[in-house]
A protein has these predicted regions:
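Glycine-rich phosphate/adenosyl-contacting loop at the front of the ribokinase-like
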Residues: 1-55, 62-69, 73, 90, ...
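Short acidic/glycine-enriched loop/turn segments that link adjacent beta-strands
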Residues: 85-88
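Ribokinase/PfkB-type carbohydrate-kinase core domain
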Residues: 1-9, 70-82, 95-223
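Short, conserved phosphate/pyrophosphate- and ester-handling motifs at nucleotide-, phospho-/glycolipid
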Residues: 45, 191, 239
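Conserved phosphate-binding/catalytic region of the ribokinase-like
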Residues: 26-27, 149-150, 200-278
């Protein structure tokens, strides 16, 4: 059983046909579905055959219940605390090459407190995946630290995804590097931009440092594993798919390079379609 702590939100993904301009009116492909980095990781893990548990916080609203039912139907166990704030939502605007711009509202999950969660939710895990988004804002950050402590005491590996170059820039690269030094994750996933914003060698942050290179593949221990050649439709959730596949393979006994080879295939599938989930 793998687990993650963080967001379960509604993704509204918009792919305009052509360049948007102010006061313009364009046709677009629009997809509405579940998202959130922690939720996506769990959804992809379940699709790959892993038991998966998501710990999150949603509003006391119809949207929250619908998102929980949707991800549970995909095989994910959900431990959700209810919040007076509305369930989170993210608008994703896609560019012509699959690049993304986000507008987000996630106050519900950011308010998840240590006293809201039960330690039992983090026991019995083989791996706990922590998006850096879950470390950027209190009280969620303190809750994530508690989760790491409990999961590790039960024998779980810890993986961290650095989540966002802009988020690291706002939070502070040196501050996040210190956080990683204290958390001591076994695995760290980062894009090139995220690794640069961190400002510290990723190799010193974890036993297995993984740098995602986009269309050029992935780098592990300085060795590059090439990406599969596919047309990028929507990269939303592709990093979560990659991390889920890497962790699944690694837990099954694959070497880091073997795990990366499997993960790039799943990541390629993820970018070839709209939406963040399998």
């Amino acid at each position: 059983m793998v687990g993650s702590i963080g967001s379960l939100v509604l993704d509204v993904t918009i792919a305009p046909e052509g360049q948007l301009r102010l006061d313009d009116d364009r046709d677009a492909s629009i997809r509405i579905g579940g998202g959130g980095q922690a939720a996506n990781f769990c959804a992809w893990s379940a699709a790959l055959g892993e038991g998966a548990r998501l710990v999150t916080r949603v509003g006391r609203d119809e949207l929250g219940e619908r998102l929980i039912a949707e991800i549970e139907a995909g095989g994910v166990e959900v431990r959700a605390v209810r919040s007076p704030e509305p369930t989170g939502a993210i608008a994703v605007l896609l560019g012509p090459g699959g690049e993304r711009t986000f507008a987000r509202q996630e106050r519900a999950v950011f308010g998840l407190r240590p006293e809201d969660v039960e330690e039992e939710w983090f026991r019995g895990l083989t791996l706990l995946h922590v998006p850096a988004y879950s470390l950027f804002v209190e009280p969620l950050a303190s809750t994530a630290r508690k989760a790491v402590e409990v999961a590790r005491a039960g024998g779980a590996l810890i993986s961290v995804d650095l989540s966002s170059a802009a988020g690291i820039r706002e939070y502070g690269g040196a501050r996040l590097a210190l956080e990683l030094a204290l958390l001591r994750p076994e695995l760290v996933f980062a894009s090139e931009a995220e690794a640069e914003e961190l400002g510290a060698p990723l190799e010193g942050m974890a036993k297995v440092p993984v740098v995602k290179l986009g269309t050029r593949g992935v780098r592990v221990y300085g060795r590059r594993v090439p990406a599969s050649r596919v047309e990028t439709v929507d990269a939303t959730g592709a990093g979560d798919a990659f991390a889920a596949a890497f962790c699944s393979a690694y837990l099954d006994g694959a070497t880091p390079l073997e795990a990366a080879g499997r993960a790039v295939l799943v990541g390629a599938f993820a970018v070839s379609r709209m939406g963040a989930r399998p």
